[in-house]
């Protein structure tokens, strides 16, 4: 082809002009055909999705997601209302008072990867903070607005029963009944005893909702196929997929439905607030969007620079290259038109990236709706595997790469070092789907949807800011107190006795009692997030069932979050474990560990919070003068 073009160029300039005209007409015809096929099916999109406006061809300010101290803008109003419930009550919900509490906590972490004791104690419903920005509409919706009705599809496998019921209850309590067509539960062949018998009847009795439909798979199908099973049973205008460990916030559904009503080829995604897996504390998420790396792993990243200039910008919606996949709304008929999910994908993993590529490349869009907020329990691990132990993430990612990424799939294969002989199944049906929908190529996606993604071998986008990184030991924290932890009735203090490594205390060092002295290994600094930090370097951590150590501050709270009364004779309580600090004996060198708080209230478990006096300005100036004299 190149040789033919060269001959044409040599023969005459007119040939070059003709080639250019032919190419231009072909491109115009392709664009018109694609947009016509979308419109002929009745799908509406923002015109900016088909040909991005200049102001949307922006570069990312930061390309890493949610890293500590990264430049992230939150959508929380400065005057956001506080949660109606007393925070101290929430803190006490995880207290382990006896062996039964400990069993519930431990079995919850084993089966669900979160604190089931706290979840049980919260109950069916609770107040949570309204985390929307102040510009979001808080006026009640009426039927006159004529929004489409929604079918909620919630799939689960071996979910914690109280958490599942609360997920449904929040939908019922915070959704206008005329907008809620039904809730469809798809049980992916759960085998936990509490879920095996009479679950549907129990849910109907506790939740008192007649349009609750229950489907139980005859075998494990996985999240991906289970969602399609639920979607095919739905009758609402809009499908809303929700995970089974969530709490929806105030007026969460209306903004999603408004967007889909105006753009029915758009997948509408709420902002996903954070529910701590250890403490169930509900906190607002920053406004971020979805991206991915060349390993096809989803990641959060900042909104492009200049997105949020004035308060009205916080209404959104914002374009997002990918979505996390756990929570989103889509027109039901458009979901079918788009090809649902890839039914040959197994269990979990990669389906969110696949549907993200497919939506954008086939004429749709993904947008984050900041005035819709849904809290989600973010777990540190996935508590289940595939039935046969297969690497479903790898298989699913290979399928999406070979269908949607064209030659760019080679970057994924090289990144993951995938053998060429790895079996990812038959993809012929998905390739036919791509052809039928007249989808764009992956080069178009990279240029128009995700230009910030660095392609290996290409020059980096210069207008994109480099990732912000701060060493963990030098990050700025807001310290609110400085003290020693003295065992009540003694002159012994909690201390770390360990050698320093490169000038820092050794991570993983345990605590023991030592004679109280104002030395760095006994000085504790408390942050506004209730972290207790040794010498402003390492965080006190409940690192095992009973072990207490100092470790790198991960800033995820939970096992590094502590409570005390700030005075004498106080228990020191860990929020994640629900247990308290206790010394083995009131002697020098005695190990400090975690124990039931009921035991810790006695000998070995009560602590005096010995606050250190801050020097006056005069004392500070005198110290500086002495240091200057020494320097001279």
Curated annotation (Swiss-Prot):
Disruption phenotype: Mutant larval shows down-regulation of synaptic O-linked glycosylation, integrin level and signaling via Ten-m and if. Synapses show smaller synaptic boutons, expanded activity-dependent postsynaptic pockets which affect synaptic plasticity and synaptic strength in both the pre-synaptic and post-synaptic assembly, no differences in neuromuscular junction morphology. Simultaneous knockout of Pgant3, restores normal synaptic strength. RNAi-mediated knockdown is lethal. Residues 147-259 are annotated as: Catalytic subdomain A. The gene is Pgant35A. Residues 1-6 are cytoplasmic. Its EC number is 2.4.1.41. This is Polypeptide N-acetylgalactosaminyltransferase 35A. SUPFAM superfamilies: Nucleotide-diphospho-sugar transferases, Ricin B-like lectins. The keyword Transmembrane helix applies. Mn(2+) binds at residues 243, 245, 376. Disulfide bonds join 136-371, 362-439, 493-516, 539-553, 580-597. It is found in: Golgi apparatus membrane. Residues 30-632 are lumenal. Glycans are attached at residues 69, 264. It is a single-pass type II membrane protein. The chain crosses the membrane at residues 7-29. Keywords: Disulfide bond, Glycoprotein, Glycosyltransferase, Golgi apparatus, Lectin, Manganese, Membrane, Metal-binding, Signal-anchor, Transferase, Transmembrane, Transmembrane helix. Residues 526-632 form the Ricin B-type lectin domain. Residues 317-379 are annotated as: Catalytic subdomain B. Substrate binds at residues 188, 220, 244, 348, 379, 384. InterPro entries: GalNAc-T, Glyco_trans_2-like, Nucleotide-diphossugar_trans, Ricin_B-like_lectins, Ricin_B_lectin. Polypeptide N-acetylgalactosaminyltransferases catalyze the transfer of an N-acetyl-D-galactosamine residue to a serine or threonine residue on the protein receptor. Displays the same enzyme activity toward MUC1, MUC4, and EA2. Not involved in glycosylation of erythropoietin (EPO). It can both act as a peptide transferase that transfers GalNAc onto unmodified peptide substrates, and as a glycopeptide transferase that requires the prior addition of a GalNAc on a peptide before adding additional GalNAc moieties. GO terms for biological process: open tracheal system development; protein O-linked glycosylation; regulation of Notch signaling pathway. It comes from Drosophila melanogaster. Expressed at high level in ovaries. Expressed at low level in testis. Expressed at higher level in adult females than males. During oogenesis, it is detected in germ cells and follicle epithelia of all developmental stages. Initially expressed during early stages of oogenesis in region I and reaches high levels in regions IIa and IIb of the germarium. Highly expressed in stage 2 egg chambers. Remains highly expressed during later stages of oogenesis. During embryonic stages 9-11, expressed in the primordium of the foregut, midgut and hindgut.
